[in-house]
Design a protein with these regions (language model features):
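Short, amphipathic alpha-helical interaction segments positioned at domain boundaries
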Residues: 95-130, 284-319
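Short alpha-helical segments that sit at the start of domains
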Residues: 8-40, 199-240
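Short capping segments at the starts of secondary-structure elements
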Residues: 47-54, 241-256
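Basic, Lys/Arg-rich alpha-helical nucleic-acid-recognition elements, primarily the DNA-binding modules
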Residues: 1-2, 26, 31-56, 73
């Protein structure tokens, strides 16, 4: 670790990588961050519980400023979940799993050593189930294996981590319940490497003649995000056309504004053109098939990685019990999420190198974006 990482000097920048899991509209405490003072307070409180006066003395800042900042960080955006918690003794402590650089690198290395085996196993699994993937009843006029695999890639990537999670739960953290909140954060001090990505979804109802529509998109190193959680689908001209074009849409029926939206929708991968017709390019399935949508890929966590996952779980459990405070052990799953972050990008690159997966040009396309509908 650098000197700054060990004990930051006031006004030196601390670069955190903080992820979220769940529904951020309930209250995302990351929205209260971004100030140098808050970054330093979080760092100090991640090492030990401290009072406002102790923090002020450590940072050479007025106690009044620190007290104001502490309340912001404790309350978060909804008054229920912040990055800090206030203890009974009046001190403040970190309220989410936050690894320092050295600990994050240790956690990542536990998974990194398993990546060659993970990639080999996933590749074999894909080849063995190719026809089954292609037989899924998508509603698109046409589809291909590449789009299907981009839809499935996170589930395939998570199979090893899910196996580790099961073993951690059964063997090391069996009596510890999940935290009872709709949204959680977890993170680490930037190690200089960028890993993984996310998955955002949006729902809308009674649009374009459909009862319910759910849209999802992933974003990773190779794929840029189309939209965020809670995106207003009904007001998105490109997505409305993608919804209308599932069974085909005659271009001649479109207004000039709709034709402009169509051109943009083709450019970003929502649609493709065949003669005078537009068709939806992102994968579309019936909501009635939701339970089956990832069913094939889910099988990968059933027995394919048991031996290797047991070794990983043992090492990770030791790290968690060493570096995570007892009151945060309910969040142990997020420590596992941090540890497993190198896997997704590594798997994607391995499959691209083998010609099994092809990324979209410039990072924007139909890849990694899909729609589930209820008529």
């Amino acid at each position: 670790m650098t000197d700054t990482a060990k004990k930051p000097v006031t006004l030196n920048k601390i670069d955190y990588i903080i992820w979220g899991s769940g529904n951020p509209t309930w209250g995302d405490p990351r929205e209260t961050l971004g100030r140098l003072l808050s970054d330093h307070i979080i760092w100090l409180c991640s090492k030990k519980a401290m009072s406002a006066s102790e923090i002020a003395a450590e940072l050479n800042v007025s106690t009044v400023y620190v007290e104001d900042e502490l309340e912001i960080l404790r309350n978060g955006t909804n008054g229920k979940y912040g990055v800090l918690r206030r203890l009974d003794n009046g001190r403040y402590a970190i309220n989410f799993i936050l690894f320092d650089k050295e600990t994050a690198e240790k956690a990542h290395s536990i998974y990194t050593e398993q990546i060659p085996n993970i990639c080999k196993t996933v590749e074999s699994f894909i080849e063995a189930h190719r026809e089954e993937y292609l037989a899924f009843p998508y509603l698109n006029r046409k589809t291909d294996m590449n789009l299907i695999l981009w839809q499935q890639i996170r589930t395939l990537s998570n199979a090893f981590s899910d196996s580790v999670t099961r073993i951690l739960k059964e063997k090391y953290f069996s009596g510890i319940p999940k935290p009872d909140r709709p949204f959680s954060i977890f993170g680490y001090v930037n190690t200089g490497k960028t890993y993984g990505g996310g998955c955002d979804g949006a729902e809308t109802f009674n649009v374009c003649g459909l009862k319910k529509i759910r849209l999802t998109n992933i974003y990773v190193t190779r794929i840029k995000k189309h939209f965020h959680c809670g995106h207003n689908v009904a007001n998105d001209g490109k997505l409305r056309l993608a919804i209308r074009a599932i069974d085909g849409l005659d271009i001649s029926t479109l207004s000039e504004i709709e034709k402009e939206h169509a051109a943009k929708a083709i450019e970003c991968g929502y649609l493709y053109r065949d003669g005078n017709m537009l068709y939806t390019k992102i994968l579309v399935s019936n909501s009635a098939d939701d339970e089956r949508l990832f069913g094939i890929s889910e099988r990968l966590k059933n027995g394919y990685f048991d031996s290797e996952a047991a070794k990983t779980a043992e090492k990770l459990a030791e790290l968690i019990k060493t570096f995570v405070p007892d009151y945060l052990l309910c969040d142990w799953r997020f420590a596992n999420d941090i540890a497993g972050m190198p896997v997704l990008d590594a798997l994607i690159e391995a499959l691209i190198e083998r010609g099994i997966l092809a990324p979209p040009e410039n990072g924007i396309g139909a890849e990694g974006c899909w729609m589930q509908i209820e008529k």
